[in-house]
Structures are given as C-alpha cells and as structure tokens.
Amino acid sequence: MALATVMAANAQKFVFKGSVKTADGKAIQGVVVNNGTDFTTTDAKGQWTLCTDTCVSKFVQISTPADYVLPKSKSIAKGFYVSVGQLVKDKCRHNFVLQPRDTKDNTFYYIAISDPQVKNDKHMELWRSQTVEDLKATTDALSKEHEVVTMTLGDIVWDNMQLFDDYAESIQQLPITAFQCIGNHDFDRRYQALNNMPYGSGVYGEQAYCTHFGPTDYSFNIAGVHVVTLKNINYMGKKGYREQFTEAQLAWLRRDLSYVPKGSMVIINMHAALWNPVEKEGNVLNANDLKSVLRGYRVHIFNGHTHFFHNNTVGNDIYEHNIGAACGAWWRGDVNRCGAPNGYLVVKASADSLTSQYKPTGGDYAQQMRVYSKGEFLSQPYSVVANVWDCDSLTTVEWYEDGQYRGKMTQFTDSDERYLQSRGSHVKECVTTHLFKATPAWGSHKVKVVVKNRFGQVHTETVDVNRAWLKALSSDKRPKVIAHRGYWRYEGAVQNSLSSLRASAQAGVYGSEFDVQITADGEVIVNHDPHLGGLPIAKSTYAQLVKARLGNGEPIPTLAKYLDEAKKHKDLKIILEIKKQANDSVEAVLVRKTLEAVKASGLSSRVQYISFSQFVCDQIIRNDKTADVAYLGGNMSPKEVKEHGFSGIDYSMDVLRVHPEWIDKAHKLGLTVNVWTIATEEHLKFVTTLHPDFITTDIPEDALRMLSKGNNK
C-alpha cells in the first residue's frame, strides 16, 4: 500500500522544458522562470527546465523582463504562464514568446482597483456603467503619455464565479494590460485553497480564478520597477479564511526577489491589508514576516479588502496604500465605509519615484476631499469638517476664515457623515482617522480648506459656513417648534409649570411638552423627575407632596389643572409624556388615569402622547385607537414602530445621527419625526437640515425666529 502511494505521488512529477524567445526565434537569456516553488533562468539559447510536482504546482510562469512588452489577450494579462495540464498535453514542453519594446519608456501608469465585488447582473451593470466607463476616459488619456497597467486587488466577484467571464469582457476594449489578484470572495466556497486540500486533489478553491487569470503569485518588470502579486487569503472553504501568507509563499517571494537588485523599486499587490490600524482584526497575521523579506527594497504595497482608505508608512522604505473600493460600500451608494468616494488609485511610477492620486468614479482628480459646512456633520455641529481620504503623516490640512489664515485643522476619529446617511441599516458603522475639523467664529461666511500631500500636490475647497442651513430654509419642510417642558426660559417661568405653558402659547409655538408621574394614592401630577421635594413620587401620597413648590413659587400642578389651563390656549398642541414607572402594573394605572383626564378635559384632539416606555405606548393604543402616540426610546426602527401602531418616532439627535436613514424611512411609512432636545442655535441649524416634522427645544423663541420664513403652525 505504501509503495503504491509513493508511485502514485511520483507519477505527478514531470520534467518540463521549453524556451523564451521572440516571435522571430531570437533567444532571450536570463529570463526568470518558476513553477510556484522552484526557479531557474533561461540559458544563452533561451532554454529552461523545471522538475515540477503537478499536485503542488499548477503553472509554469515567467517574470517578463522590462525590455519586453507585457503579453496580453483582449487587455487581460496572458501569455506569461502555462498550466501544468497544458504542459502535460504538449509533451511537457512550452515556448514563451515575447515582443521586444519598440522604444524604452522609463515611466508607466499603474492603476490599482480594489474590490469590484460584483454579485449579480445588477452589480455588473453598475461596474460597467460607472467604473469601466470612468476607466475608459482615464486610460484613453493616460495611454497617450505612457503605458497603462491595471491591477484589480481581489474580490473581483462576490462568491459568483460565473461572473469572471463578464468581468474580463467588460474591460477588453480598454488600452491597458490588466492583471488580477485573488480575494476571499474569488474562491469557490465549496473547497479549501490548494495548500489546504488533500495532496493530489483534483479540485480546489482558487481553481476557477486560475482558469481565467492564471497563477495567484507572480511577478513582472516594467520601467525599472519589479511588480509582484501575492495571495494573502488562506482559504478554508465555506467562506472561512485567514488573512495570511503561507511559508511556501514567503519562500517563493525570497526566491523571486533574489533576482532583483537591492535598492530597487518594488510594487507588491495583495488583497488584505497588512498594517491598517483602524480594523486590526482584518490585517494579515504574519505581516512582519513579509516585512523581513522586503528589507533592502523601496516598496509600495497596494491592497483593498477593507472598503475604506488608509495609508501607512512602515519604516523608511515601505509604504502601504490600503485604497477605497470600486464598489464602495458594496454598491449601496457612492462612498466607501470611510466616506471616500468609489474609485481607484492612479499611480505614476518609475525606477526612481512613485506618485499617486485617487480618482473618484464620475469625479475628477481635483476631488481629493469632502468638506462639510457647519451643521452638516452631526457630531461636530459647530465645525467645518474635511474628509481627506488619501492622506498620511506628511499631509497638511489648513484653513482660512473669510480670507484670514487660521492654521492647521484638528484631526479626529469618527464615522463619516456621508457614509452614515448612505449605508444600509445592516451594514456596520466604520470609523476613520482622516477627518479634520475647524470651528469658525459666529458671523463668519466662508471657510477655505487647503490640503497639501506628500508629493506637493495642493487641493483647495471653499464652503459657505451657512450652506446647510440656508438650503434647509429654502425648503417647505421646516420643522414645527415644540417647547421642551414649556417655555421655561421665559421670565418668571419654570419647567413643567402653568407659567411655562402660558409662555409657550404666547410665543406662538406649535406645541408645549410636559411630563406626568403618578403618586402612591393615584394622583397624576406634572413633574419630570421621579422625586419631588426629596420624596419619591411613586411612594408618596399627593397630600405629602402638595406642599412642595416649583422654583418660581408655583404649586406642583395636577394633570387636571394643567389641562384646564391648556383649554385657554386653543391653538396650542399638548405634548404629553408619560414617564416610565417601576413596573407594568403602575404604568397601566398611569395610562388609564391620564387618558381619563384628557377625555374629561375635552382635549383629546389636541393631545399627542409620547413615552420612553414601549409598554406605555402599547397601552395608550390599546385603550384609545385614535390616540396620536410617538415612541421616545430610540431602539426601534421605523418599521417596528409602525408595526406597533404608533404614529411617530421621537428620537434624540444622537440616535438619528447613527440612523439618519430612519427619518426618510419613517416618512415613507407615514410616521412623523420629532428630534430632541435642541439647546443651541447651532444644533437647530443642523437638525433642520435633516427635515424632521418637529423639534423639541429649550429655545423656542429663538427657533421660531430662525425658522421665520413661512408659517410655522
């Protein structure tokens, strides 16, 4: 049995031979040839020989020398490799044919494209109509100056191997030589990678990819630059994988680089990031092993996988470009998870230098940042914010206020506002470090942001400080104003008092909000906190609490007295918050007594109920099918709120910053949207840009003044 196994294994080993010549038969000496494990070079006759185990090696390939044209077919890089299956069919011989370059060009353009990730025909159409159309214009222009090489950095498809043909067909008319790198979604999920399958297996995870595009690890030379592509996805099958190089791959790279002089410019392509500090869990596990192999070379590494942009300088000689994806956040919008637009990186390279510039799909090279005016970036409502995606430690981001130089903007980490607004609710948040902020003075008009990158390229953008606010004011969707606990900042008034209710009516707001609690003996009183005069309301009788006074000397109003006062102000809506209680039983009693009081007052048509308690909201609907009820909790989507039969969402600014899409979804479901609590004019300006139906604010008169265009009723 053991002997048979050895014989079977040996039967897979072949001595492959061949040559590397020009079309007219001229031998090319010194060409590096390898089978993924062993290396050789062609002799003076252009001949090569490699003993190859076809259970381990699936290709024999050359590293095309810089003096020869990169072989291709219909724009896809071909001709630099031959499958071992074809070699066996051809009696173990293969002759590579190369074309000498007519002229020597010391510069070339290199376009790095990350994650097309097409899953279906819809995605393929987006790839064709957006990315490929943009690439056509770009490569048509660049190819008039220098040769253009493209590299797709993995996740060409999204677990749909049948789309490899469509991808190849989509770029066949471009004036490029297109190379590919394998990503985790380019494996057939039924199988593990070849290195993890049983020895001699006839199937493996990267088989379909290899059939279309050749070996996963390969190299070539152009304009004095050595270019290497490596698989760094160790695929386990069923979508499982580790970002990792195998020891065999690192050994292959050492052999490959042994033919390249130290100090040379080297480009390395791979799918997963190596040293991305934002999401370290997705980095290659043995990245530092690669680092040691690259010692002594000037290296630029290009990768994707993260769907966001981040540059890293690693020591003095390694620069990692973890670029934004062509599909952005999986074709759900026009931005990546970091806010960088969908696009690709255009690199100008030679043996001595390498410069790069991101090209947004559908945009131009001048679009190297997105600048948010005051009120457009929710977590920074007072600031102008610049998202400068292709930046690094040598990038400077400075600002001018109405023509006056103000210095460097402050870098900070947060989620990009554009991404938060465009992402689906099932796509997780992502933070980025390439955000910069500056706070202009009150009354300023224009802010100019000036970005200078490591290559000396300068980009500027100027914004109107009040852009978002002015746009919102020009809309018919200005929110109605609700006074938070009444207009308590009015002279002589305090929160949740009859005086603050009267002041709300006098100010002309849409509604006045207040809170109710229930005493131990069942009296419903108006108060926000669960304690009054040092006593717990729920455990105290009304008689024990009645002597307490508000800050202006008014007695604590009962709900009945509050509603009696509300009757006098017929144009004022009453926004009644039923506070959460110790348990469902107490809440049920509070709901029943509140509804009875409202019905007795004759104000049912003017009262809108709100509560943080889902149980309270459900009880209101159960007892009064016509009640107008909005949920305050912030933990339910508009769809869930609608399913409960509530009429609106009443959420804080913080909640709606995380889920800005809920506003539009709520409106489409016929729900109203209120945002609370607006305490400053800057917050008011920002929230207005979200187009809610209502705002609850501590500055109702200021809000009315600022929203004075049109009728607020």
Model regions: which residues?
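N-terminal active-site segment of His-dependent metallophosphoesterases
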Residues: K13-F16, D24, S73-F164
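Short, ordered, surface-exposed loop/turn motifs in non-cytosolic proteins
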Residues: F14-T37, T54-C55
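Hydrophobic beta-strand segments
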Residues: V31-N35, V60, V397-W399
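Extended active-site neighborhood of metal-dependent phosphoesterases/phosphodiesterases
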Residues: A66-D67, K72-S73, G85, M161-K262, ...
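A short, solvent-exposed loop/turn motif at the edges and junctions
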Residues: N35, C55-S83
